[in-house]
Each structure stands twice: as structure tokens, then as C-alpha cells.
């Protein structure tokens, strides 16, 4: 029995070695098997920290995830990602390098690529068509050196699936489209920590999530979000210059469910009509602002509000109070009461 167990574990060891026999000696490879009797396998390859002199690196033919981060790579050529094994990539991590230039066809062979991480590099621009034909669903361009960005770069990618784009913590003063008539399916756009002074015009983009935290926006005009009628979550936190939100700024956001206006210390007052049109809003964060107490008429603009945060220790919630039944007048009209956990305050 003992000999059989030894043979069994020996065979397992040989199988594991065989599964990663094409793994580069400086990389770490992990095989994942799927299907009946593990008939299908994919390999995750970690080639981070191997140094710039070792790229491009040969990888197993069934590689699905490749990590090339932290290699001090300065550029991506047309041939660097075109060797055997690269065409099956689903996920590619090029973060935390020194990449300042990417050739126009650098990703052209990666026809299955869904996730691309280019964060923490030195990129200032990207060539038109660099994402042509890619089925990307997630792209991280955060912590680079972009000063302006043309979203039309994404019109040439495969449009079947929505994409999440992270451009946070760059140097952006402008984000725009030159051809708003072309379809552009971006689901989530992260623009936090940039230098935008106004709400960007994002016409023709069916965004559901938008983050503008930590920009230099000083005022938000009436109708600033009129083109973003499908927004579900909007974050406008930490706008150190924000002093004014005009009435009707959110008037077209009938699908918005969560609005974050926290940490805007210069925002002193809010006209009740600022919240007009927010008929689906359920969560509102006003913590660390100076706009409390709020007028009762504010809540009339938000019939579906469920939760309001007014400070670190002040959280409000709406309770539906069923009216009592009276023999003479029948069922009394129910009331919605907003209760705050600050000394039992009721607004």
C-alpha cells in the first residue's frame, strides 16, 4: 500500500513538472485545470521583477494571465507581445514599470485580452488604434502622466462588452471626444485625483459609474450631467475648490441611485432644487460638508431616498410609517419619516 502511495505522488509530481516545463526559469507558473477529468488547462505566469533585459520572455502556449510588472520596462514594441503563448492571453499586467511609449500595434495579436493593467508608468499619450479589435472589459491607466485624453481611442475596440476605464491620479486637465456620433460603450470611468476644473462633456457614453473625486472643480452648472442619463453612481467627493452647485445640476439623472458629495469643505449651502430630478436616488453622502441642517423640501426632490450620511456619527434613514386605522375615516395616510441617529433628530 505504501509503495502504491509513493508511486501515486511521484506521478503527481511528474505531472506538475510536465505542466510547467516551458516556464521561464526566472518566472513562476501556475497551472489551472478545468473540465471533465481536468481535460483543459490554462497557465498563470508571473514574470514580475525579472528585469528589463529578459523581455520579451517565452511563455507556455496555454498562458491566460501574464504578470510583467516591476521590470523597469521603458517601451512596448510591436513584437514584444507577439510570440507563442501571447495570443491566448486574457489578462496582462504591465504596471509599475517605466513605460513611456507603446507602439501602435503592440497589442494587435492579443485578440482574447480582456484585462490590461498599465498603471504606474510614464505614459503621456497613446496612439490611435492601439486597442483595435481587443475585447477589453477592464483597462487601468491610473498613475501615469496624461494631461489630456481622447476617449475615441476606445471606438475601435470590440464593442460587444462594456469597458471599465481607470484614469485616476494622472495630470488630466481635459478629457474629450472628437467624434461623439460613434458608439462608445464605457460602463465605468474613474477620473479621481486629476486637475479637471469643470465637469467633462461625455456625450454619447452610456456611463453607469463616474468618479470625479479630488479634482479642481469649483462649480457645477445646471445640466452639467444632462448627457449621462444612465448614471447609477456618481462620486464628487473631496473637491477642495467646490463652492457652488447650481439648481438642476443633476436634473437628468433619473436613474442615479448613489450620490457622494462628501468632504467638500467649501460647500456651504445647497438649494433644494439642486436635487431635482433625482427620483431614483437611494443613498446620499454629505459628510464633512457645511450644508447641514438641510431643508425639509430637499427630501421632497428625492422620493426614494433611503439613507443620508451627514457626518461621521450622523446617519439618517427613512422609515415607512403605516397609518393607523380609524373606524370613522378608515385607513390613515402612511408617512415616510427620515430619522437621524444624532440625539434622535428627525428631519
Swiss-Prot record:
LRR repeats: 62-83, 88-109, 112-133, 135-156, 160-175, 185-205, 206-227, 230-252, 255-277, 280-301
SMART domains, per database record: LRR_TYP
Subcellular compartments: Secreted
Ranges of residues in domain LRRNT: 20-61
Top-level division of the source organism's lineage: Eukaryota
A cellular component term, taken from the record's GO annotations: extracellular matrix
Residues bearing attached sugar chains per UniProt: 285
Other facts noted in the record for this chain: This factor is named 'Tsukushi' because its expression pattern in chick embryos is similar to the shape of the Japanese horsetail plant, tsukushi.
Function: Contributes to various developmental events through its interactions with multiple signaling pathways. Dorsalizing factor which functions as an inhibitor of bone morphogenetic proteins during gastrulation.
Protein's UniProt name: Tsukushi
Species of origin: Danio rerio (Zebrafish)
